[in-house]
Design a protein with these regions (language model features):
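Acidic, metal/ion-coordinating pockets
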Residues: 1-197, 237-249, 259
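Catalytic centers of hydrolytic enzymes
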Residues: 74-83, 87, 94-95, 163-470
Length: 470
């Protein structure tokens, strides 16, 4: 592809040192820097490259690259040993000033694996608009991560986010008037170019054909039977087979008494029948490990209160139970209904018997009575709670803001670290010869929870119709 530079993303770091260190070396051997100027070693120097200086048509260009500063909230520390991740503000401006003074580039591009965000300084993982508003001496901010396809121009700087899945190419244009190497005038603009999936590059297709076929063969192999339909959207209305499966997997961890889990696929149907390996990516799309963490009963309740507060409103007649709003879809431009908050942070609990009263305010909705086996639940007792590595590291702020737990110091609370959850799913299917409704819906194992009062069900159904149609 002959890239001039590549930025490190959180899913690169997720692969671990063995992979991304090799990728960095391979890229470097081909003259391509792997950029992440805010991933710093204990001595303060960048772990990866931080800048690329190049010339095009006599114009000197500086490309500064940075990655997401929120890595610690998603990934286990063993994946990023030897580095820390600094906030992009004020670091990016400081680095721009240093490079501009030293190299005197005529064009400056800041490429970040960070989302567009809201521009109000509140979203640590998405600082694109924050940078657009504050940076000086920069022509383009190229961002990513949150899959929002958008171009924003402010004064003499453009933000470009091409979205996800190679559906668009971000296209920035700059017009310069130069005299004796000095910039007399400059203008920038940008747009997004739709990728035509029918126009295949035959050389690229040939180069990757054997790799494609190998992956295809692996993902199409049969792995077991599914005797019940799984619909991920059912997770938002209460207990459902899909979430029951995820809780069953989590509670299979040795010593786990309770599990926290959220739907990681927003709206997907996995129909009963013969499963292929590729279906496992629909059931569990991310590379999260399973951790077991010690929490008190009171902390469990507070975590659930925080989770459900991002998920539901305090219901009033003719209002919405689900915390939804109508707005424009950034990907399609069409108006639709959507959750205000990220559904992948809508944790419910397995292994407990509890209710969530939608008529009560935050802090008094969740009433836990027993464990799944009937043992009385105590606010003062300690429990082993299975959760993703993302959640244990502070992702979604459920532990920190919900229960006041210091997620920077979790080591004393972590009881066990297990394999990636998709691998646990695969092993479960092999051991159980498939996924069977009787096993995953066993309330003696996964417990039971529901929204109350029962009269709220009709309002929830209306909200679900707004979100997903009839």
């Amino acid at each position: 592809m002959k890239y001039d530079a590549v930025c490190v993303g959180n899913h690169d770091v997720e692969t671990g040192h063995n992979v991304y260190d090799r990728v960095a070396a391979d890229l470097k051997a081909n003259g391509i820097p792997f950029l992440a100027g805010n991933a710093v070693k204990p001595d303060g120097k960048p772990y990866f490259d931080s800048v690329r200086i190049l010339k095009r048509h006599g114009v000197k260009i500086a490309i500064l690259g940075f990655t997401n500063p929120n890595m610690k909230a998603w990934l286990d520390e063993k994946l990023w040993t030897g580095m820390q991740f600094e906030s992009l503000i004020p670091l990016v401006q400081n680095e721009v000033d240093l490079i501009s003074a030293k190299e005197k580039p005529q064009v400056v591009i800041v490429a970040i694996h960070s989302g567009t965000g809201k521009g109000d300084g509140t979203i640590y993982e998405s600082q694109g608009l924050d940078l657009l508003k504050s940076l000086r001496g920069v022509d383009f901010v190229v961002c990513s991560h949150d899959h929002s396809a958008v171009v924003v121009q402010q004064d003499s700087i453009c933000l470009i986010n091409s979205g996800s899945r190679a559906q668009n190419i971000g296209h920035g244009r700059i017009r310069l008037a130069l005299k004796d190497g000095k910039v007399l005038a400059k203008s920038v603009n940008a747009d997004l170019i739709k990728v035509n999936a029918d126009r295949v590059d035959s050389k690229m297709e040939a180069a990757f054909h054997s790799d494609y076929e190998a992956v295809k063969k692996f993902t199409l192999r049969e792995v077991g039977d599914l005797d019940i339909d799984l619909r991920t959207r059912d997770s938002y209305a209460g207990m459902c087979p899909y979430m029951n499966l995820i809780h069953t997997l989590s509670l299979s961890a040795k010593s786990a008494q309770v599990s926290f889990a959220a739907p990681l696929t927003f709206n997907k149907d996995i129909n009963a029948g013969r499963l292929i390996y590729n279906d496992l990516f629909s059931i569990y799309p991310y590379e999260n490990q399973l951790f077991v963490v010690r929490l008190t009963g009171d902390e469990i309740r507070k975590c659930l209160e925080y989770s459900y507060d991002s998920w539901i409103n305090t219901y009033v007649p003719d209002g919405h139970v689900l915390k939804i709003a109508e707005g424009e879809d950034q990907r399609t431009g069409q108006k639709n209904w959507h959750f205000i908050n990220r559904p992948y942070n809508f944790d419910s609990a397995g292994g407990l018997v509890y209710t969530v009263d939608v008529t009560k305010p935050y802090g008094s909705r969740v009433c836990i009575t027993t464990l799944a086996d009937g043992t009385p639940f105590s606010s003062d007792a300690w429990y082993n709670v299975a959760m993703t590595s993302y959640r244990a590291a502070g992702g979604g702020y459920i532990l920190s803001k919900g229960a006041g737990i210091d997620t920077d110091n979790m080591e004393d609370r972590i009881v066990a670290r297990h394999d990636d959850i998709r691998n646990i799913l695969y092993d479960y299917i092999q051991k159980s010869n498939g996924i069977h409704a009787a096993e995953i819906n066993d309330t003696q194992r996964i417990g039971h929870w529901e929204f109350v009062p029962a009269s709220a069900a009709q309002a929830i159904d209306k909200d679900m119709t707004l979100l997903f149609g009839e």
